Amino acid sequence: MSQPVFPTASGIFLPDLHHDEVSAPQLVMLANVVVSAEASASEYSTEGKQMMELQTVACSSYSDSEEDDDAVVRYSMDTSEDLYTQQASHIQPEPVLEEIEIVRVGRPPNQTESTENAASAEQKRTTLAILESSRKKKKPFFCKPCQYQGENEQEFIVHIRTHGTKKMLVVNGGDSDEDLSADAGPQTSVPNAESAESNSKGVIRCERCGYNTNRFDHYMAHLKHHTKEGEDQRVFKCTICAYTTISQYHWKKHLRNHFPSKLFTCSQCSYFSDRKNNYIQHIRTHAGERPFQCIYCEYSSSQKTHLTRHMRTHSGERPFKCDNCSYLAANQHEVTRHARQVHNGPKPLSCPYCQYKTADRSNFKKHVELHVNPRQFLCPVCKYAASKKCNLQYHIKSRHPGCKDISMDVSKVRLRVKRSDGDDASPNKLTAEQAKIMEELEDAGPINLSIKKPSKLNAVVETEKSSKKNMDGKANQPQPNEKKSSSKNDPKEKTAKKLKGKTAVKDTEETQTEDTRVNNKKETKKAVKSAEKALKSRQKKEKPVKDSSVQQQSDDCEQTQHTPQQNETQENRPEKENRSLTEIANAKDCGKVQTKKPCKKQTKTLKVCGETQNVEEEEIMRQKAGKRKAENPAEPKQRIKRTKKKKDSGKPTTSEANQTNPEVMESESSEANNASKPDDSIDESQNPPVAESRPDVEPPTVSDCPIEKAPAVEDVQRPLEAEISTAAPDAPEVDSGNEMPSPTDSDGAPGFTPTLPLQHKPTDAEDDEGIHSNDGGSDISDSASEGSYDSGLMAGAEKLPETPTEERDASAARLLSHTCIFCDRSFALEMDYRKHLNRHLVNVYYLEGAAQGGK
């Protein structure tokens, strides 16, 4: 069964007053309703099926409040124009008096009729005296029941009280029992007042007709309906909402909001519209088409309205004027904003930094942005200053289109002056945060988000920084030059050329005796280092077997195992050999002094464990690393490692003969620290004693373990290798760009140390606002920037994206802003947008069901 839809509830817009205290415009409305109550019940059969048209009420007293659904306000179909014009003709006073008499005769007989007869006689005499003058000239305060004309509002109020509010209500309702009960007292106005409060739309209320809204500009536009006088002036009213207008075009346009005939939906986003032209304009934003071009400059737009607004910048035309003052503007929205802020409009938005208040949300955002990010981008042509680079670009393109050679000087710009609490943290806090990030990365597996392919030289620089953090306990913040070099493509090649030049100069200074001596030591050092790492990895794995945490320590062994392999692959290159030759001479003295203390400790561990098991552990660890590298063949870096590892796998025989030479191993660790940076050799000579002091504590605790437990450890580790290889991701992907400084540093520090340029983008002036810049002059920037103080609204204090995926998500979130096609409000969240849209379309399905049921 279809549910009939009736007009808006009776008494919605009636004020909370006693019946005897109704204001003069309301009484005029009630008196006029008596005159127009001639409609039969047949005229209301199709009332709930579509939009109706409100019949004109004389003397500019337009009403949005209706009594019961009969004999209140007559409606006619929009299509019946001829019938409407006949009904809107002038009404003769004689039938009015007859109707009033007929209605009053039908009242209950318990009331005295003497007063009514006297009142009717008085009305007839007044009608005969004023009939001719009323036809020629009518004053605003005109009483239709008795044809009384008041000079001002006060006289009219005094006169209208003579009729009595109760009599007017009885005349409206006839003999119905409900209206008779309404005559009993003022309690009947309370339910209407409650319904008015519950159904009210806003806080601003029209005193004449009860129209209410929460927007001051809508209220000012509504008052224009009352200023246009005349009986032939029609008022069109929406039966679903409180919309009223005097324009039939706008009334039909509003009707389409409730009854969309066809919806055009965008396949790329959630936009939809019932207007094909709006849909075509929206599709152009996705395709990048800008067919509307300016004839005076290079400006182009996807919408004709934007081009029309742009042309006013060339002509200087300001056609929109404020109704209350002499303010002129090029756009209507500027006049609306001016009326809100200047002419008694509510200002609910207040700035938290100063006493600024406004009603415009866009201006509020721009004002707060000036506190956080002041205007530092200055126009070189005029005195305009912008808070963002994209706004200055749009300003130059729109205001100075002829100046093509303008270059923006952003060298002195310092953006993001007021940062959040996380950005203002001290270096020690940054170190703690980075340590947490590194632990999370180790647990979750390696993630490489960088687009560029890191070279070996960049890896050496990163290991130098990580070694300093591990030895000193403090994070050395990179200089701005290092930040810029990490964000560009060329610095890696430049550093390689510089290092080659330095090594070439230093090679000429070295003698042939040093070259031959170092080359002989190098072959022995590699074998000793690989054997020593295998021994330490076995000793580290014995503890997790006892503590039931084998998997975590196996990851640490993975990182320590790949370190000598990276050193071997790196030393095989001729460039690395030339560089290491020059650095050994500088670190020679330091290495000899530092290798005396750990010699005894290392010899003890070698005696306890034995040479045969060292060879077995070395083979096991190499097989495990080979399996894990074979798991991910997609990375080209890991393929290179695999091939180089196979070449070096045939050297375990030399490691057996040279295991008892700890001095060579310690000098190799000092070379690894010094070979990473040639210029910092002095600093490296001071740091190794701190790093080398760690083996004094750890190896004695592990060396007490008996030899008989080694086969049991091997039996436990072999099934664990299959589990780790399938469950854990490949760790060498992270370590490919970072080499560990020494064999013992892996115990005290995490294996993966991301540098600061990976966590925060450099605050370069050219790249700071690349997300917000619109080189093509987008439509959003057009509509927001023209005639306003600043066009960037939504990007006030956003942080720069830290990763490429975050940047992609941020750009996608901006594209998904939803704009209501009915009231042009924008919503960032789709959920809020859907809720708002349901308010417009809440009665569509009910009305369609009613229309189908009526057929």
Curated annotation (Swiss-Prot):
Biased composition (Basic and acidic residues): 462-472, 481-496, 504-535, 570-580, 628-638, 711-721, 799-811
Biased composition (Polar residues): 186-199, 548-569, 652-662
Cellular component, GO annotation: cytoplasm; nucleus
Protein localization: Nucleus; Cytoplasm
InterPro entries noted in UniProt: Zinc_finger/UBP_domain, Znf_C2H2_sf, Znf_C2H2_type
Any single GO BP term: response to hypoxia
Protein name stated in the entry: RE1-silencing transcription factor
Stored Pfam families: zf-C2H2_REST, zf-H2C2_5
Region ranges (Disordered): 172-199, 458-811
Gene3D superfamilies linked to this entry: Classic Zinc Finger (3.30.160.60)
GO terms assigned for molecular function: zinc ion binding
